[in-house]
């Protein structure tokens, strides 16, 4: 067996803690900015959807690098794993610099194009937050690349420790900039940017350090090599298209929510912030499966890949139930933390409880199960399913339930649940068929 129960726990537990810390950054930002009113909350929320789009594409490219690195490690070819890790750093740095230049150059036009109907006070907050946070994209890219490299060798403690650093800087920065200097949205944005800059620098140092089994110890590794880049992009491009289209679809849905008013936009933002906590166990196990299945495929152990997927998926359900049941009963109490209006608070409680019930049954199948398919190289299937389901079910159903039937934000969330159900059915069928194991190793 490639991974003992102890090995899996050593990989998964730090990932869960890392995901918790990542979610806390968003929660702290939302709580801090809520002191400045619903317009500030809504403005930050709108930009966070664009930031998520950029981050998801980075994560997709990082996934490509992690899969290739893991498969080389499974074959025992550490030097080639080292080279592919360096190429991942190069690809992500180029992408993130381009995104920063574009975002800073076209901040207001881009926001107006996507969210043109929002109130002017919300737009002003969004412009300020977007411009500052966009400057940190290159450092976020460096962090994502490094985290993927360390996860590929089964070391998730590094990214966990850096997440702790990010949270300390973010909380301290918020306390200083928001409460002492009274910079409101600008203070929250600056804290987030500084935490990302610090994480990127520290991660880059560690990637090149002796503690990394596949350390990148020479500048020659960073010179673009199409042979390795092609392998990374074989996974990264379909995953990037999938994640990108997924987030674009979400942006369209958020634009739809924005037409329902500031209370609905704020409630939707708070809802997404809170549900991230419920998703932590299943999301962490999905990340772990990229490493586990990737190494199994690289070693030619397809039976073990299937066995570990079933085992970790079962664990993800246990974690999902452990988080969602308490959140269902605490929804009202949690919503009260965000200083929302009575209308926004009621909307938040309703959508949270609906999420908690539905998530118990289909969230892990919809999201955790897709990662083993990606790690095996079956990325075109996951991309096709995710894109079709997003546009046909999430966007289409959101419009029908939210606008046509007049259910507002609740209708949009029902559309999201329909999307999950469709994805779950497709991924389960693919997994049972065994066709996802036919792609073979990229290494």
Residue locations for each model-derived region?
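Helix-terminus/linker motif at the lipid-water interface of multi-pass membrane proteins
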Residues: 24-42, 111-120, 176-185, 244-277, ...
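Transmembrane helical elements of multi-pass membrane transporters/channels
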Residues: 10-29, 132, 165-166, 195-199, ...
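Short alpha-helical transmembrane segments in multi-pass integral membrane proteins
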Residues: 1-15, 69-136, 169, 180-237, ...
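Short runs within selected transmembrane alpha-helices of multi-pass transporters and secretion channels
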Residues: 62, 132-151, 159-167, 188-203, ...
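N-terminal transmembrane alpha-helices
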Residues: 3-31, 35-36, 52-64, 68, ...
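Small-residue hotspots at the loop-to-helix junctions and early N-terminal turns
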Residues: 38-49, 126, 130, 189, ...
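Residue-level hotspots within the lipid-embedded alpha helices of multi-pass solute transporters
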Residues: 19-23, 56, 96, 100, ...
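Small-residue-rich hydrophobic transmembrane alpha-helices
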Residues: 41-101, 140-159, 265-331, 363-387
């Amino acid at each position: 067996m490639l991974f003992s129960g102890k090995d899996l726990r050593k990989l998964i537990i730090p990932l869960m803690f890392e995901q918790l810390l990542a979610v806390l950054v968003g929660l702290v930002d939302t709580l801090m900015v809520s002191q400045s009113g619903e317009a500030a909350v809504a403005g930050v929320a709108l930009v966070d959807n664009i930031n998520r789009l950029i981050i998801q594409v980075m994560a997709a490219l990082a996934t490509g690098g992690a899969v290739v690195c893991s498969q080389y490690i499974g074959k025992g070819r550490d030097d080639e794993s080292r080279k592919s890790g360096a190429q991942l750093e190069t690809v992500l740095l180029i992408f993130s610099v381009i995104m920063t230049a574009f975002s800073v150059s076209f901040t207001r036009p881009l926001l107006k194009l996507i969210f043109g109907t929002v109130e002017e006070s919300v737009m002003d907050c969004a412009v300020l937050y977007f411009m500052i946070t966009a400057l940190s994209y290159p450092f976020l890219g460096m962090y994502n690349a490094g985290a993927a490299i360390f996860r590929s060798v089964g070391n998730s403690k590094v990214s966990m420790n850096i997440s702790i650093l990010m949270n300390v800087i973010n909380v301290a920065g918020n306390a200083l900039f928001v409460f002492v200097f009274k910079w409101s949205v600008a203070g929250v944005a600056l804290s987030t940017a500084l935490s990302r800059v610090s994480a990127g620098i520290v991660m880059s140092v560690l990637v090149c350090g002796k503690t990394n089994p596949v350390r990148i110890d020479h500048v020659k590794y960073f010179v673009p090599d199409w042979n390795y880049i092609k392998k990374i992009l074989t996974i990264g491009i379909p995953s990037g298209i999938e994640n990108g289209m997924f987030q674009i679809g979400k942006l369209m849905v958020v634009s739809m929510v924005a037409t329902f008013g500031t209370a609905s936009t704020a409630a939707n933002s708070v809802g997404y912030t809170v549900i991230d906590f419920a998703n932590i166990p299943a999301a962490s196990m999905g990340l772990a499966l990229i490493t586990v299945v990737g190494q199994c495929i690289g070693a030619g152990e397809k039976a073990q890949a299937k066995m570990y997927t079933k085992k970790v998926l079962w664990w993800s359900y246990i974690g999902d139930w452990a988080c969602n049941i308490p959140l269902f009963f605490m929804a009202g109490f949690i919503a009260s933390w965000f200083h929302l209006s009575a209308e926004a608070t009621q909307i938040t409680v309703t959508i949270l409880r609906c999420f908690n019930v539905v998530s118990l049954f289909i969230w892990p199948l919809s999201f955790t199960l897709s990662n083993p398919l990606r790690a095996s190289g079956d990325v075109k299937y996951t991309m096709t399913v995710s894109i079709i389901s997003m546009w046909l079910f999430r966007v289409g159903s959101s419009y029908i339930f939210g606008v046509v039937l007049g259910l507002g934000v609740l209708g949009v969330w029902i559309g999201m649940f329909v999307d999950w159900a469709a994805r779950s059915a497709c991924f389960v069928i693919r997994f049972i068929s065994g066709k996802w194991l036919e792609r073979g190793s990229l290494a």
